[in-house]
Amino acid sequence: MKPLRYTASALALGLALMANAQAVTTIPFWHSMEGELGKEVDSLAQRFNAENPDYKIVPTYKGNYEQNLSAGIAAFRTGNAPAILQVYEVGTATMMASKAIKPVYDVFKEAGIQFDESQFVPTVSGYYSDSKTGHLLSQPFNSSTPVLYYNKDAFKKAGLDPEQPPKTWQDLADYAAKLKASGMKCGYASGWQGWIQLENFSAWNGLPFASKNNGFDGTDAVLEFNKPEQVKHIAMLEEMNKKGDFSYVGRKDESTEKFYNGDCAMTTASSGSLANIREYAKFNYGVGMMPYDADAKDAPQNAIIGGASLWVMQGKDKETYTGVAKFLDFLAKPENAAEWHQKTGYLPITKAAYDLTREQGFYEKNPGADIATRQMLNKPPLPFTKGLRLGNMPQIRVIVDEELESVWTGKKTPQQALDTAVERGNQLLRRFEKSTKS
């Protein structure tokens, strides 16, 4: 009977372990963070899981922002959506209209977890809030602004002051020519050309990108980025491209790699690219503010955010939503939000995270790490510089990329390209407007 007793005990222990394993609520989290950023996402999830053994956050990289958004919406339609979906900022209007989401303020309320929406930096939270109620629909996560990265060693070689990055676009054009003449393969390259060269160029120089305060005041907005100021800017880049001082290297973040591998002396890219630059650059580099147009009357104004937020998907059970609320609360805690900001270069999404980072002396030890925040808070945003809320904006960005590429290849003039981009983009806006009223 002794072996039987042991067998029964072992069986009971096994059943208990199985019950405990089954009690763990798994929470799928689809994201677009790769490289060093992906490692930081995994680290956050592991720490949360260790502190909350009843829940298991499972981060999964699902490709770039467009791919992840498409995958998430497709999965929702088949009943297989993740609990948490990371969506880039220009997908906000699409997510709001999708009926696939559960507002984060509802998630916290139903979970009985206190949620102070005022803790988030207003210029960030305003992007993801319901225009009618003011409540957050998604939780800010990896918010960024474009910054200028420059190779200090290359500056020295070209006879430029390594502590003085270009302040205006006119300065940048001059610096790029000198850097190219000094032997650099590429004087200047830009990542995310639509976001930086049109969306943020417009806001930073106090110009609207679209009517209706960039879509915040209604879905009947029309695009307005084909005005003389934007055309002049693209024409300047076109001239730089003809001279070989500006190199077009791709639609997304390809310029960051061209920068940290030493090919390009300067790049405008996301502040969130800092993690990879820190890891891979083998030279002294600096971080500067986005250049502004020297002819713009009140520039610089304020930058608008890029990056992404975390959306909670519909159709999950109560326990899953409780775990989601706990995880989002974990991410917003000052020590976690500050660490994410410091390690990645993304903005501190809460006031407490910014204060903690400053108190820790991080900005003194890492000059330039506060540039993205300073740009966002440079001046109080105007009604048309607080961001974009335009339907089908991901597809509009593709159109902008196509039309700008037609400029770099000499097929169209800047005016022709921007006029066509506005015309094609407005067709998508009308389609979105119609879908929201049907």
UniProtKB/Swiss-Prot annotation:
Gene3D superfamilies: Periplasmic binding protein-like II. GO terms for cellular component: outer membrane-bounded periplasmic space. Its main location: periplasm. The keyword Chaperone does not apply. One of its GO terms (biological process) is transmembrane transport. Pfam families: SBP_bac_8. It comes from Escherichia coli O6:H1 (strain CFT073 / ATCC 700928 / UPEC). Residues 1-23 form the signal peptide. InterPro entries: Bact_solute-bd_prot1, SBP, SBP_1_CS. The complex is composed of two ATP-binding proteins (UgpC), two transmembrane proteins (UgpA and UgpE) and a solute-binding protein (UgpB). CDD domains: PBP2_UgpB. The gene is ugpB. This is sn-glycerol-3-phosphate-binding periplasmic protein UgpB. Belongs to the bacterial solute-binding protein 1 family.
